[in-house]
């Protein structure tokens, strides 16, 4: 698990320009949406489901009076407890969102970023999040898209003989994603609606071109960014890496 923490912390400072851009773009999009959610739903209580290395917890603690970080992994909870030492309004809690013991209708905002792809019953998890929100509360959600080339490459990268080459190219932590439940945008919208949410805003980001990303550096990144601008909102938007939602309970 310490390897996973190391990986998550490395993503935003990666020596690879594409890898760094993909994750920083996602972080910036989530942070922008969290600020909007706090301004809309109020700055009372927020919950982050699956905080991982805790990249969003300091901002949540700035925006909200009371912040709960729930996870099933002790390493992530231990990391959150360290952050709580400097953020007294942060409370880490061991909790499984698929069988949550947190009080119903007790949060103004729930953040769930890059989590439901690890949960087989994502519909059940979304229903649980809806139940934790006060009426009118907001969910900030992100998850990878099923047909993203990056997700396909992530599966290929761990085939026998290939992973050694990939690690040699990146020269930083490379671990299997553990994604077992990748959704298309229509599937994600259907599950959100089935859980009782109304989608207020949505979007996508992230172009990954195999080999271009690994071997052409900043030149390749500029090409990927140019392609992304032309794909967003178009018929090929399902190939972008991450999908984002701001939804009301």
Predicted segments — roles?
Residues 3-28, 55, 72-79, 83, ...:
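S-adenosyl-L-methionine-dependent methyltransferase catalytic module, highlighting the catalytic core
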Residues 24-43:
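Conserved alpha-helix/loop element of class I SAM-dependent methyltransferases that forms part
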Residues 43-52:
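Conserved class I S-adenosyl-L-methionine
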Residues 53-64:
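Conserved SAM-binding loop of SAM-dependent methyltransferases across substrates and taxa
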Residues 66-71:
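Conserved SAM-binding motif I beta-strand of class I
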Residues 86-99:
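Conserved SAM-binding strand-loop segment of SAM-dependent methyltransferases
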Residues 98-109:
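A short acidic, Gly/Pro-enriched loop at the edge of an enzyme's catalytic core
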Residues 112-115:
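A short beta-strand submotif of the Rossmann-like class I SAM-dependent methyltransferase core
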């Amino acid at each position: 698990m310490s390897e996973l923490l190391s990986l998550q912390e490395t993503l935003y400072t990666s020596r690879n320009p594409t890898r760094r851009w993909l994750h920083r773009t996602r972080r910036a999009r989530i942070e922008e949406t969290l600020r909007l959610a706090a301004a809309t739903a109020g700055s009372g209580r927020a919950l982050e489901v699956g905080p991982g290395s805790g990249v969003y917890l300091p901002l949540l603690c700035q925006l909200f009076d009371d912040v709960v970080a729930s996870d099933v992994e002790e390493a992530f909870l231990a990391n959150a407890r360290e952050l709580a030492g400097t953020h007294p309004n942060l409370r880490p809690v061991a909790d499984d969102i698929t069988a949550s013991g947190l009080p119903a209708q007790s949060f103004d905002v729930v953040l769930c970023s890059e989590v439901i792809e690890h949960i087989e019953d994502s519909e059940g998890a979304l229903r649980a999040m809806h139940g934790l929100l006060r009426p009118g509360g907001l969910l900030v959600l992100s998850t990878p898209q099923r047909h993203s080339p990056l997700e396909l490459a992530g599966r290929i990268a761990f085939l026998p003989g290939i992973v050694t080459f990939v690690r040699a190219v990146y020269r930083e932590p490379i671990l299997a994603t553990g994604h077992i439940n990748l959704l298309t945008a229509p599937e994600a919208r259907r599950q959100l609606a089935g859980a009782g949410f109304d989608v207020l805003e949505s979007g996508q980001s992230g172009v990954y071109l195999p080999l271009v990303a690994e071997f052409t550096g900043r030149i390749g990144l500029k090409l990927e960014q140019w392609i992304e601008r032309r794909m967003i909102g178009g018929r090929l938007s399902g190939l972008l890496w991450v999908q984002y939602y701001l939804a009301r309970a």
